Amino acid sequence: MTFPFSGAAVKRMLVTGVVLPFGLLVAAGQAQADSQWGSGKNLYDKVCGHCHKPEVGVGPVLEGRGLPEAYIKDIVRNGFRAMPAFPASYVDDESLTQVAEYLSSLPAPAAQP
């Protein structure tokens, strides 16, 4: 009995069926590791916004202030007044970079009469 596929066909099937999916899985895992919160908006909505959204009125409004990334990282890591510190195990540095970029892209909230 002969095997119906040539050596080249077997290699192509192996690459397509085994190697390629494994590579995609590894790449997806790396992308997940790059930022544990996925995006700056997601982090802001799920963590920061509970105190810092304009309509909440607990912490200072961050939107449209143009706060430097280094300032945001320092406050988040060390805390300040009523704001607790958040360790890197909870909010990674890449996520802080993304939230700083997100906040700088937002306009300042409209002044209240």
Swiss-Prot record:
InterPro entries: Cyt_c-like_dom (IPR009056), Cyt_c-like_dom_sf (IPR036909). Binds 1 heme c group covalently per subunit. GO terms for molecular function: electron transfer activity; heme binding; metal ion binding. It holds the Pfam family Cytochrome_CBB3. Residues 1-33 form the signal peptide. Pathway: Aromatic compound metabolism; p-cresol degradation. Keywords: Electron transport, Heme, Iron, Metal-binding, Plasmid, Signal, Transport. PROSITE patterns: CYTC (PS51007). Heme c binds at C48, C51, H52, M83. SUPFAM superfamilies: Cytochrome c. This is the heme-containing component of the p-cresol methylhydroxylase. It accepts electrons from the flavoprotein subunit. Tetramer of two cytochrome subunits and two flavoprotein subunits. This is 4-cresol dehydrogenase [hydroxylating] cytochrome c subunit. It comes from Pseudomonas putida.
